[in-house]
Amino acid sequence: IGPALPNGLALSWESVPSRSYVEMTVAMMKELGFDITLEGNSVTMAPYTATTPRTIALERDWSALAFWCEVVALSTSASLFFPGLQPESLQGDRKVLDYFEPLGVGHTFTSDGLQLTKKRSLVYGKLVYNLEQCPDLAQALITTCFALRQPMEIFGLSTLPHKECDRLQALVELATELGITVQ
């Protein structure tokens, strides 16, 4: 609502989970012609000035891809294509490809999109992930590691209890049901 306010809006914060979403929002607002500035931990939006209407293309959702990466990781053979996903992305969840690669998920970009393929797992020991900037990947990544009995250490999950349900508690309950030790 910032640009709709008579004096615009200025916001500051000490820390922000998922900073990439703030950066993506600012970039999209700029592309639409809004006067918005992000500097450090503050954002300033000037009052809206009417401009020529613009149409922009929205990126595909990278967090939704995590569950398809899980399907590939848990399969013995798979090849899936996702039109429209490109390597350049403002979304923090773009890291999903890096996180699932050691679990046997290969990827190739084409001009039309993204190809996922089953590869040999590259894991030798415990995986360590920091999901502070992409917490929406936690469910798919953690349940994949559960299913593969892959030791892992994951941190940066402080926002999970504040989603539509307590995602962290749900994952702990699932681990308990599967006989997996969670610390």
What spans do the regions from the language model cover?
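Short, structured segments at the rim of ligand-binding sites
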Residues: I1-Q183
